[in-house]
Amino acid sequence: MRRFLFWSLCFCLLFPVGLSSCDGSDSAAVIFGGTTGELTWTLTEDGVLTITGEGPMPDYRDGGTSETPPWYPHVNRISSLTIGEGVTRIGDYAFMLCSFVTEVVIPESVTSMGDWAFWHCQSLKRITFPDRMVRFGEWAFYENESLQSVCIPEGVTTIPSSAFARCHNLTCVIMPGSLQTICGGAFSQCHKLTDVTIPDGVTVIETGAFPSYLDMAG
């Protein structure tokens, strides 16, 4: 018995891969990964997509081109998203069609977000913006049908065209005092958005920014 224990311990020390079973760790294995621009990404077997590093994320294209995000071929495996502190920008089309992600917390290091960044993330119910974010792109949250509330951070001056269009379950939008412009289609077809308070600093509300029935209080 002593000899068996001795060799078992030697095996664990000599082969670190086996440590997960020796120490009881149950962390999920990385099944895909690589680099994108200055950043690194991994996708684990339990569906967690993690982006780490320092700097901006590149801009990508939609699913009909060769310039899609590197994790796009595995989009149906992604159930959770972790963006690491140090990432400064979320690129165009970065997380399009991540249909099983339910919540996203964007780190404080991110100051801007590209167009179509979270397009058609049908299960996304909540997104937390960092205080430092000053810009997000057109169509950024288009067709996020489960999104229920949005608190836009202070510092944002423009809500771009169709940014939250077709978010059918969106009921609450909190707008910052820094806001100046609400572009056309920003909240188009948000059928459950029934009342919005417009900050005093808003000087431009373009045609079709809100559903036609909406009663806006300024």
Q: Model-derived features: where do they sit?
A:
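LRR flanking "cap" motifs
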Residues: F32-R89
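Bacterial N-terminal signal peptides that target proteins for export
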Residues: M1-S8
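Consensus positions within tandem repeat domains that build extended binding/scaffold surfaces
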Residues: G91-A94, G114-W119, G137-A140, P160-A163, ...
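Bacterial N-terminal signal peptides
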Residues: S8-G18
